[in-house]
Design a protein with these regions (language model features):
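N-terminal beta1-alpha1 cap of cysteine-dependent amidohydrolase-like domains
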Residues: 1-78, 82, 88, 95, ...
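Conserved small/polar residues in nucleotide/adenosyl-binding loops
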Residues: 120-121
Length: 122
């Protein structure tokens, strides 16, 4: 059976991701255990919150190098919302905080615009 690991680092919408995967017939495991993450067939990094706080939690749980290993070994890896942002090198939101560096670039803030502007919320 395929194992899909959802990384738990206290900054994610874990249950909604788990529920969606379960509805698709998958059996995901929510974990912060490095062995479970490294042995998974697929890995998901969800996220809600600020770039700096989330990177701090990944360091606290000693998951930064684990995630980099997952990418290096070619395991399919999906970042959702903040999880995708963390895959980049840095973010303007938290100047001086290094991201995972799996993708080149910096996450930019949406610039302020005069007048009413609507943004799509997904």
């Amino acid at each position: 059976m395929r194992v899909i690991a959802i990384i738990d680092y206290d900054a994610g919408n874990l249950r909604s991701v788990e529920k969606a995967l379960t509805a698709l017939g998958e059996k995901p495991v929510i974990t912060s255990d490095s062995h479970e993450i490294l042995s998974a067939d697929k890995v998901i990094l969800p996220g809600v919150g600020s770039f700096g706080d989330a990177m701090g939690r990944l360091h606290q749980y000693e998951l930064v190098d684990v995630i980099r290993q997952v990418a290096d070994q070619g395991t399919p890896f999906l970042g959702i919302c903040l999880g995708l942002q963390l895959m980049f090198e840095s973010s303007e939101e938290s100047v001086g905080v290094e991201g995972l560096g799996l993708l080149r670039g910096t996450i930019k803030k949406i610039p302020d615009c005069p007048g009413p502007v609507s943004y799509t919320h997904l």
